[in-house]
Amino acid sequence: MTPGEIKRLYFIIRVFLSYGLDELIPKVKLTLPLRIGRFGFFWIKNQHKGKELGERLRLALQELGPVWIKFGQMLSTRRDLFPLAIADQLSLLQDKVASFDGKLARRYIEESLGGPLEQWFDDFDEKALASASIAQVHTAKLKENGKEVVLKVIRPDILPVIKADVKLMYRIANWVPLLPDGRRLRPKEVVREYEKTLIDELNLLRESANAIQLRRNFENSSMLYVPEVYADYCRENVMVMERIYGIPVSDIAALKAQGTNMKILAERGVKVFFTQVFRDSFFHADMHPGNIFVSYEHPEDPLYIGIDCGIVGSLNKEDKRYLAENFIAFFNRDYRKVAELHVDSGWVPADTNVEDFEFAIRTVCEPIFEKPLAEISFGHVLLNLFNTARRFNMEVQPQLVLLQKTLLYIEGLGRQLYPQLDLWKTAKPFLEDWVHSQVGIPAITQALKEKAPYWAEKMPEIPDLIYGALRQHKFLQSNIEQLSEQLKQQRNKQRKSQYLLGIGATLILCGSLFFISASNRMAIAFMSAGALSWIIGWYKSGKS
């Protein structure tokens, strides 16, 4: 380890011990050196003894800084790996940090765009509008038309910090599987997933492309508005987009004061999510309250505004079908169907015992129906199914983990806005309509429509392809006949050689008998003839 890594590691150890997180170390023989090593830091005391473990962990990550805050936020979505009390505390982590110098931000943007800001923008505000761990946002106006925009710029010092901390995380992850039940936590997978998320968020060209696609998907929609991206000014570390004005969706008091129809707003959140997943196969996977606003206009017919498209997810057609049918089967309590769908989709191994799997699902999920249907959480249904399936060697599906995380956000948000929200009643017609649209005449017609351009392009080639196939067939047929004849001749040769070998063996045996009976002349004759037959047979066998 480098001196810098050692210094950083000491800081992490000091923070963790000052929050009493050494109690997370399992009391097993393997961790004895660690527990003894704890006494080597005897001067660092637990300064937060009155707080619960989950809260102490959250506060420690908050103190360690932005990289660890985002790591904690990601861990809060992995409720299949951690106790709910800890996951709930981690979900409270706020990705808010002090902004860096606006003059530095200006210089950094100018370097990326290749000229002074005044060439493209007026009224650039060096005071950040908002600041987070990865980037911060400044306001300005486009010089060409006076439109208000925001400029998002990556922190210039963030990459070395990310690399150093992720490297330390990997070192820790290499050690965790040695602990009892450590493999179940899949530490390397968790760190790898986090690293990928960070790398994606560091590339604002990726976020720009995501925002452009999401805006196109909801163009002229009455449910969701996505601000316009000005792609000409976007670079890997700078993004320029339309400035929006709205009420943060978490500000319930302001929404009610505005006269917002909370029931419609909550239901639209669910519809927006399922539209993204099942219609578009492209969903915003970071829909926490900080990224969602509500337009000031038409509060009786509320419109969501979505920002920050750095993390998105997608499902292929098969995943969508299995997911929709899983939900429908679950709410119909058809656990056999749920088990079969998991096997058919390849989410669990093909040799899984369906009866055992069905029983395990029933045992875990049946108690859920003790609640009224309106109170059942889709996200926790998925979580229970994934946890059960993992016992049957279900491979982690990253796209489903993202989906489950987003679904939990949407559910929590919907019930915060309108506690009486019946998620199943809102989603069921959507799911059933989508499943029905995938079968029957409409589905066939749609498939033909989608393939029409392909077949129109290939149609002129069909006569040549048929002619080539017929010629190839004739050539293959001729070769097959020749091979068949050669095999026949070879089999005949083999039969002859085997016949001669048999005669040779018989003659040698007879010669041996004559030799025993003292008839030397007959013995020599028979044995010579037998040897000759054997040699000829062996020779022919070798040639064939």
Curated annotation (Swiss-Prot):
EC number: 2.7.-.-
Record: residues binding ATP: L129, A130, S131, A132, S133, I134, A135, Q136, V137, K152
Keywords noted in UniProt: ATP-binding, Cell inner membrane, Cell membrane, Kinase, Membrane, Nucleotide-binding, Transferase, Transmembrane, Transmembrane helix, Ubiquinone biosynthesis
Membrane topology, record value: Multi-pass membrane protein
The organism's place on the tree of life at top rank: Bacteria
Cited Pfam families: ABC1 (PF03109)
Protein name (database record): Probable protein kinase UbiB
